[in-house]
């Protein structure tokens, strides 16, 4: 028991249970009857809390400095309403005993503030309700709605500006992260304020309804239950009801004012006092003009001379003081410049790792006319397509592609975009931001009016048309593609060609974690057989030739077995390809038939001799064997021809070669004829039928 008590007290000291207990106590006031003395304390606390919130709202330099305000607004509104319930219970049960039955605070507001006259009190209460409900609350609610909408609409532009500053080196990564959090917090704050303003409005409506209920109920109870005269019942219950209403409505008005001040703040430089000094009182000429007007009114017969003369003197003195400030500012300017220079020189020396911007694996920069493609209001078309590209590439290669960052770049042309891989520009293009791309197909007939151009990704001739021409282009057989899809297709092409470069050590860890979940013992054996450097070479060799790492269990099994014979990453990759031969050849097979080109005997013998001689002379990688320049020129002309001939025949371009020649010829195919797939004899499954279309000579 003692231990439990100590733990509970420790939680209280840590502040973990403080707020929940306060909320539970507030809710308990609805059920439990409260003595008048406790009501006095709670009403006083309610007024003090409202004053504190108002002062914090006035002194806050920007709304995010008081981000807790929506929550406080909800709690204080709930507290005020529960106090209304508790005080109503006391007034109706014990109001016949006299005005002091509901507590000293309610009695004081009923007697002192409204002079003991229930008519005056009723009028004052109605005026307060009009000010609170119609003026302050209504305006704050509207401003909250507009601020929330505009803040959400401005988020993409603010994020782009942060990314632009980061790219330009104006801020570091930590500062960019802080700014992004501020932008998100600002959106959350104004969204919460939009809802919190409904609390204030509901509180004002509830105050009017509670007043009416207390008024009618109290008078009826006094007359019919306690046999009071109508005049005595009105005098007694109405004064307590009005006092109760004023005690609740004054804090409500203070909080409504605080809410209005928070949502109307547009400056991030200082509090309200600072803004008043630097904006309202900044111009001496305005103050002198107001001084003259006050003096003229003071000398008009029948006017109260003293108040106008006092304000005339006060405004004149303020204007004179403000006119002296520019001179003082000039006197301090030189010392300020010296101080600024010293600070700048000191800050320039504070260079650390944190100030060096990190290189992002993949990023897409947009000109300002293309920024609309990532606008939430338009459905984020580019963001969604880029996310789809990342998903498809990750699924196809069996590795998680890094996130593709999208940002605005003011250095680009308005309709230009650029794709960066590891911080280096891989490609760029300029497309009409407000047009659609019409791509001709085999079923296209006729020509459509538009701007002729080329597809940024593949260089095919296209026509850029207006959105209104889309239906016509589709009817003519064109494929119509929007700007977001054009950019996403280009990103897809570029990223696929850089997959091996994007695969790094951390990806090996994630890949092996995946393997451990499926085959824990195999993962341990693989880690013992090959280190990360060796594995990275093997995985990159496979990805370079488009071999997916999805079947990591089979790949790991082969690597563990083959690593006892060799550590050469090319030979290890060849063994993996042999194990995955069915998945590798599957895209090229038509009806169990594989159509290929081969090497003629003369070329095959020549290349075999070159490879054998190179290996005898020293350790040379199979894909880096030196070849005669004339033979390279021959490959440069014949390999593209083989590729085009097979594509023209409707076949997948495949070149079948001996195993020891495959790494070398696959490298040349990537250089001279991208898309020409090089297979070795032993990579063809036994059940397939080979059809030789020709021979490379």
Curated annotation (Swiss-Prot):
Q: What is its main location?
A: membrane
Q: Which UniProt keywords apply?
A: Cell inner membrane, Cell membrane, Membrane, Transmembrane, Transmembrane helix
**Localization terms from the record:** Cell inner membrane
Q: Looking at the UniProt record for this protein, which Gene Ontology cellular component terms does it annotate, in alphabetical order? A: plasma membrane
Membrane-crossing ranges are 19-39, 40-60, 66-86, 116-136, 204-224, 242-262, 280-302
Q: How does it sit in the membrane?
A: Multi-pass membrane protein
Q: Which processes are annotated in GO (biological process)? A: bacterial-type flagellum assembly; protein secretion
UniProt family annotation: Belongs to the FHIPEP (flagella/HR/invasion proteins export pore) family.
What PANTHER family does this protein's entry cite?
Answer: FLAGELLAR BIOSYNTHESIS PROTEIN FLHA-RELATED (PTHR30161:SF1), FLAGELLAR EXPORT PROTEIN, MEMBRANE FLHA SUBUNIT-RELATED (PTHR30161)
Known role: Part of the flagellar gene cluster Flag-2. However, the Flag-2 flagellar system could be inactive in strain 042 due to a frameshift in lfgC.
Name the UniProt record assigns to this protein: Putative flagellar export/assembly protein LfhA
Name of the gene encoding the protein in the UniProt record: lfhA
């Amino acid at each position: 028991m003692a231990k439990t008590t100590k733990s509970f007290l420790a939680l209280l000291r840590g502040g973990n249970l403080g707020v929940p207990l306060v909320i539970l106590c507030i809710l308990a006031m609805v059920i439990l009857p409260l003595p008048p003395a406790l009501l006095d304390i709670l009403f006083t606390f309610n007024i003090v809390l409202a004053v504190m919130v108002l002062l914090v709202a006035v002194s806050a330099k920007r709304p995010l400095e008081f981000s807790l305000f929506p929550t406080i607004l909800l709690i204080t509104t709930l507290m005020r309403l529960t106090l209304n319930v508790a005080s109503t219970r006391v007034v109706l049960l014990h109001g016949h005993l006299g005005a002091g039955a509901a507590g000293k605070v309610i009695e004081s507001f009923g007697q002192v503030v409204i002079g003991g006259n229930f008519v005056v009190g009723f009028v004052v209460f109605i005026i307060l309700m009009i000010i609170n409900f119609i003026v302050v609350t209504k305006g704050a609610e509207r401003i909250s709605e507009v601020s929330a909408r505009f803040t959400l609409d401005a988020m993409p532009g603010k994020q782009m500006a942060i990314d632009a500053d980061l790219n330009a080196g104006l801020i570091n990564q930590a500062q960019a992260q802080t700014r992004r959090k501020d932008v998100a917090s600002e959106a959350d704050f104004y969204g919460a304020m939009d809802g919190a303003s409904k609390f204030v409005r509901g509180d004002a409506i509830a105050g009017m309804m509670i007043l009416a209920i207390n008024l009618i109920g109290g008078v009826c109870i006094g007359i019919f239950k306690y046999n009071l005269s109508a005049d005595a019942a009105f005098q007694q219950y109405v004064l307590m009801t009005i006092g109760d209403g004023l005690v609740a409505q004054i804090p409500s008005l203070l909080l409504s004012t605080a809410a209005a001040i928070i949502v109307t703040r547009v400056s991030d430089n200082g509090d309200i006092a600072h803004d008043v000094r630097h904006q309202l009182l900044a111009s001496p000429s305005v103050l002198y003009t107001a001084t003259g007007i006050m003096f003229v009114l003071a000398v008009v017969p029948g006017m109260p001379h003293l108040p106008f003369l006092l304000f005339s003197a006060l405004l004149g003195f303020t204007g004179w003081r403000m006119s002296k400030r520019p001179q003082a500012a000039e006197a301090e300017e030189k010392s300020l410049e010296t101080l600024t220079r010293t600070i700048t020189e000191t800050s320039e020396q504070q260079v650390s790792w944190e100030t060096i911007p990190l290189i992002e694996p993949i990023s897409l920069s947009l000109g300002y006319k293309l920024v609309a493609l990532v606008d939430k209001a338009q459905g984020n078309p580019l963001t969604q397509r880029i996310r789809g590209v990342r998903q498809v590439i990750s699924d196809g290669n069996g590795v998680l592609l890094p996130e593709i960052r999208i940002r605005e770049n003011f250095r680009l042309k308005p309709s230009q975009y650029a794709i960066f891989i590891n911080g280096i520009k891989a490609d760029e293009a300029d497309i009409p931001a407000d047009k659609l791309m019409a791509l001709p197909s085999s079923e296209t007939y006729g020509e459509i009016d538009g701007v002729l151009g080329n597809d940024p990704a593949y260089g095919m001739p296209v026509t850029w048309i207006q959105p209104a021409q889309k239906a016509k282009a589709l009817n003519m057989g064109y494929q119509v593609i929007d700007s977001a899809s054009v950019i996403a297709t280009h990103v897809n092409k570029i990223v696929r060609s850089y997959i091996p470069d994007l695969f790094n050590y951390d990806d090996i860890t994630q890949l092996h974690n995946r393997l451990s979940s499926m085959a824990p013992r195999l993962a341990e054996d693989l880690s013992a057989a090959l280190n990360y450097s060796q594995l990275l070479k093997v995985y990159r060799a496979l990805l370079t030739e488009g071999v997916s790492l999805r079947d990591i269990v089979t790949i790991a099994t082969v690597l563990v077995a083959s690593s006892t014979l060799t550590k050469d990453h090319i030979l290890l990759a060849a063994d993996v390809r042999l194990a995955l031969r069915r998945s590798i050849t599957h895209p090229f097979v038509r009806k169990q038939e594989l159509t290929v080109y081969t090497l003629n005997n003369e070329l095959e013998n020549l290349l075999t001799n070159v490879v054998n001689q190179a290996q005898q002379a020293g350790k040379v990688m199979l894909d880096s064997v030196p070849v005669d320049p004339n033979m390279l020129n021959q490959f440069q002309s014949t390999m593209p021809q083989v590729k085009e001939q097979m594509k023209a025949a409707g076949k997948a371009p495949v070149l079948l070669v001996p195993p020891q020649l495959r790494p070398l010829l696959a490298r040349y195919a990537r250089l001279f004829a991208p898309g020409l797939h090089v297979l070795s004899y032993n990579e063809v499954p036994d059940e397939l039928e080979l059809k030789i279309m020709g021979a490379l000579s």
